[in-house]
Amino acid sequence: MRRPPNNATISVMDKTELVGQLVRQFETSARAALSARDAVVQEARDGATPDEKREDARAAHQAQSMGRAQQKRAQDAMAAVDTLATFRPGKLPPTAKIGIGALVEIEDADNGEGRTFFLAPVGAGMTLHGPGGDGDFVVVTPTSPIGKAVLGKVNGDIVDVTVEGDVREWQITYVG
């Protein structure tokens, strides 16, 4: 049976650090989106003469759309931060059913390829760094195909997941 990187056991404090990394990534994303929004607004306001602005309504409309999209991106990132503010994943015994907050390792039944992921309410696809050099973890949400497949399962269960049109069989080899 495979274990998480470096045979580590993820503790409550470690998961708190993983959540902290997620928060920092979302905060960085929000700041970048707000900066991009401000740059678009500045360019729309100062980048053309009044005559050019009147003649090119299409460019003004595009700038407005980009500004709104960046504002939405920032709002979405801050909503994720709000969600994580109350997210307190605890340590799970190896026999626990998988739920949000679990650290899960799965292994491909055909080739033995393993993946370790952190099941979180937000942050799909983000990469987190394990505390103390315990390796990297990808964030999976419960709405993703793999998230849906593993919810409620236990160590040793086998799940089928469709990846790029192919059904793959994965065995759960660690829950923590």
Predicted regions and their residues:
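Helix-rich terminal scaffold detector
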Residues: 2-80
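Sparse recognition of residues in long alpha-helices and their boundaries
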Residues: 42, 49, 86, 171-172
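Long amphipathic N-terminal alpha/beta scaffold segment
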Residues: 65-112
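Non-DNA-binding regulatory cores of transcription-related proteins
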Residues: 92-162
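Short, charged beta-turn/beta-strand-edge "cap" motif at the junction between a beta-strand
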Residues: 110-111, 162-170, 176
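Short, conserved beta-turn/loop elements at beta-strand boundaries and strand-helix junctions
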Residues: 124, 175-176
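C-terminal structured interaction module
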Residues: 153, 157, 170-175
